[in-house]
Regions:
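Carbohydrate-binding surface patches
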Residues: 112-172, 206
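Solvent-exposed loop/turn segments at secondary-structure junctions
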Residues: 21-25, 56-59, 157
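Aromatic/acidic polysaccharide-binding cleft in carbohydrate-active enzymes
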Residues: 33-88, 101-112
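Structural recognition of the beta-strand scaffold that forms the well-ordered cores
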Residues: 14-19, 43, 49-53, 152-153
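A structural motif corresponding to the C-terminal end of an alpha-helix
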Residues: 3-13, 45-47, 82-94
Length: 214
């Protein structure tokens, strides 16, 4: 995805990603969290379009298990409801991201000092409770057509949720709003754990949240 992002931004070309939502060859049937991870990682890296493989289960010997969004019998599989939930989020975030240009990407892995990796982003620091697992995040930074910065924070683990404490890089006179994944509207930042220091922003396994700063 890094090389795709570099080339798409260099040539001002829209990048699309095409990924599995069914078992295929040596690839196992993805969970909803794994599909969500593929979708959000694509968005963090600046993708402007996404395609599922496959919408309707193909025929032939290569796909004996079936299992696409629509089965060979024409009935909806459980992937249909998964794609519907993910697509709702995509519709909300897409309204903002289609008006954004990717400016930076940071990957925070276990052992990193987040504040050092996030200097070019709209996030100043990410901290964790001492009982939580080490950091594992993707952070995409964008320039919105309004002049504001957009930041997408993603949990890079698809097997565990995350509960980070996030400090944004907010300059005097600016504020942070979140894009509601249900409605696409700008909503005030909400601290999920007011009894803890800082602002806690939980993330689903493979999940992401989108913010505007300005």
């Amino acid at each position: 995805m890094a090389s795709v992002r570099i080339n798409s931004t260099s040539y001002s070309a829209a990048a699309w990603n095409f990924f599995n939502i069914m078992p295929y060859g040596p690839h196992t049937d993805p969970t909803e969290a794994q599909v969500r991870w593929q979708v959000n990682a694509s968005l963090v890296y600046g993708a402007k379009g996404l395609l599922y493989f496959c919408y309707f289960t193909p025929g032939g010997d290569e796909f004996p298990k079936g299992g696409a969004i629509i089965g060979q019998d024409g009935l909806k599989t459980y992937h249909y409801a998964q794609a519907k939930r993910i697509n709702k989020m995509l519709q909300s975030y897409g309204k903002v991201l289609m008006d954004c240009t990717s400016t930076d990407i940071a990957q925070i892995i276990p052992g990193d000092t987040p504040s050092e990796k996030l200097r070019q982003s709209g996030i100043r620091d990410i901290k964790r409770d001492r009982v939580d697992p080490p950091h594992d995040y993707l952070v995409g930074t964008f320039r919105h057509k309004s002049g504001r910065r957009a930041v997408m924070l993603m949990n890079n683990r698809f097997a565990y949720s995350a509960w980070p404490t996030v400090e944004f890089d907010v300059r005097p006179g600016q504020r942070v709003v979140e894009i509601d994944p249900e409605t696409g509207r700008e909503v005030p930042l909400h601290d999920a754990s007011p009894l803890m220091d800082g602002v806690q922003l939980p993330l689903l396994d493979g999940g992401a949240r989108l913010f505007l700063i300005g």
